[in-house]
Amino acid sequence: MKKILALTILISSTYTFAKPNNGAEQDIRSYSLLHGVSTAEANKALVLEANRDSALDTIEKEFKGRIGGIYVENAPTYKIVVRVKGYGQNEKRNVAVGNAISKSNLPIEIQYGAKETRENAKGQLNKAAKLASKYFSKVQTVGYDEKSGSIYVRVKGKQTTENQRKIDQIKAEWNNPNLPLEINLVNWSVKPLVDANGGTFVAGQISSTMYADCTTGFGIKNANGTKYMSTAAHCPNNFKSKQDGTPYTFVGEIPFAQSNDLQWNSTTANITNKFYVGPTTTRTLTGRRTLSATRVGDSVCHYGNATGYSCGTVRGVGVIVPEYDPNTGAPLFPGSFWVDVNTSTCGGSDSGGPVFTALTIASGILSLGAIDDVTGACQGYYYVPTDKIYENGFSFIY
């Protein structure tokens, strides 16, 4: 366990629309409200979102070394936009995706004229973070905007004459017209969100007088088939279910300092492929989405101790969170794997909970929140992608 401010943990999974008990109506309604589209359009979009990966793998190969960005437009209809460096004839494609039961046409729009590739731009994120940190002490997030082709830096601070002068100095020093640098002043800070079905609400003692709340994530297993329940490493080591008192015993963790936030616990409960999306409602995990398959504009949902079930939109993939320990100077949340989700619904004790897409596809484990220091309002959250589970020898229980 690591920090008192961390978010609760949940369990996520993939989806199968053919099974009515897998929550299609719940996600369709959420998508419709989130993007302002009809329920019919929402249903169509979720089907496309669940079946698009192979089509986009083909796009990645076709334009290898030239892609400036790939993102999702959710309204008025679902489509994929691919920005390509260099010259060419813009085009619109419809690619059949789906399964043996049903297929749909995935709209893909190819736009030429990008000035820089995504790979080269992401290779400049640390440079941008270091430059901004020369002028500001509270840089929160640095990422690449795949829609605009610019690098964005979000800094905790107010709009003042002095801060504007610093922003102008940073941009002058950056001076790269092919890769613009945008500095945004924000009123929030990035913090861990702490306050055997996945999504179980749990609490564990962290001192003689204090307990921390979290949420469990997904059922996982190692190469030998031994099953564990996952959560965030910054959550308590040992904890109990707040519902029935089931104990979860610490086995191991890979903390922030090792560019992760993964913990696994054993329990007397039967660990399955189920995860909660409501007080008594579960879904069945059917697959996972990797970091490379995650797109800006994706709709993702989470379930947590503090806020229950809610959905948001991915606004950054592979972002960095350049916060440093004021005493040692060590990075608090190292790594360039974080996925940034735009939502107003998150809170302490959501840490460790499941983040999922297309009903039952696991996206990752919820870890950090962008929290207003005055009001406590959520301005978004960051999750650890499924890659960080699999690269350490674990896999989901399907």
What are these regions (language model features)?
Residues 81, 109, 180-184, 313:
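Ser/Thr- (and often Asn-) enriched beta-sheet segments in non-cytosolic proteins
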Residues 22, 49-53, 161, 288-294, ...:
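Soluble non-cytosolic domains of exported or imported proteins
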Residues 22, 29-34, 43-44, 52, ...:
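Short glycine/threonine-rich beta-strand-turn micro-motifs
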Residues 62, 99-104, 131, 169-173, ...:
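Structured segments of extracytoplasmic/periplasmic soluble domains
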Residues 1-18:
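Gram-negative bacterial Sec-dependent N-terminal signal peptides
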Residues 186-398:
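Terminal interaction modules at protein C-ends
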Residues 65, 75-79, 105, 148, ...:
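Extracytoplasmic
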Residues 37, 41-44, 112-133, 137-144, ...:
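Protease-domain processing segments flanking chymotrypsin-fold serine proteases, especially trypsin-like
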